[in-house]
């Protein structure tokens, strides 16, 4: 009888845990606290969340694994861009809302000296940055 009681208690705990809702997942980036400069409204393909992985050569020969992810949303009549990037094999990270420039089919990063650009070519979205041999094709992230 004691074993049956213990078994029932465990069963009730597991059922209770399975039906309890946890907190809703945080949206990637949360809410914008800064907005983009818009010259021309963004191509609809740029909207939403996109990501890419690519190798970039550092120095003369060392390959550096990079990851980039962004989320472009519209709030009222403004556009917010949350940008997340890792480099130096994940040891360096940057994640923040950006006040970059949107000009139709492209988003230009600031300061321009880093050469960050997200752009539409055909039906695809690409990312490029200084010292990257060729643009990295991005993949849409289902939210």
Q: What does each model-identified segment do?
A:
Residues 46-47, 71-80, 102-106, 117-125:
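Short, solvent-exposed coil/turn segments at beta-strand boundaries
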Residues 23-39, 92-101, 126-143:
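Edge beta-strand at a domain terminus
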Residues 2-10, 14-58, 141-143:
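Amphipathic/hydrophobic helical signal segments and adjacent flexible N-terminal regions
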Residues 52, 79-83, 107-111, 125-129:
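Short hydrophobic/aromatic-rich beta-strand segments that constitute the beta-sheet cores
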Residues 57, 83-92, 113-114, 130-134:
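Short, solvent-exposed aromatic-acidic interface loops
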Residues 61-102:
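N-terminal glycine/threonine-rich, aromatic-flanked beta-hairpin/loop signature
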């Amino acid at each position: 009888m004691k074993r049956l009681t213990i078994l029932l208690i465990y069963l009730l705990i597991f059922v209770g845990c399975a039906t309890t809702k946890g907190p809703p997942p945080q949206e990637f980036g949360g809410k914008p606290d800064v907005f983009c400069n818009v010259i021309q409204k963004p191509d609809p393909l740029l909207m939403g969340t996109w990501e890419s992985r690519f190798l970039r050569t550092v120095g003369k020969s060392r390959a550096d694994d990079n990851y980039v992810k962004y989320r472009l949303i519209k709030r009222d009549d403004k556009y917010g861009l949350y940008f997340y990037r890792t480099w130096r094999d994940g040891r360096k990270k940057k994640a923040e809302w950006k006040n970059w420039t949107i000009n139709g089919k492209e988003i230009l990063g600031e300061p321009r000296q880093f050469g960050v650009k997200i752009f539409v070519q055909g039906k695809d979205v690409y990312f490029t940055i200084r010292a990257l041999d060729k643009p990295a094709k991005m993949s849409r992230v289902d939210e």
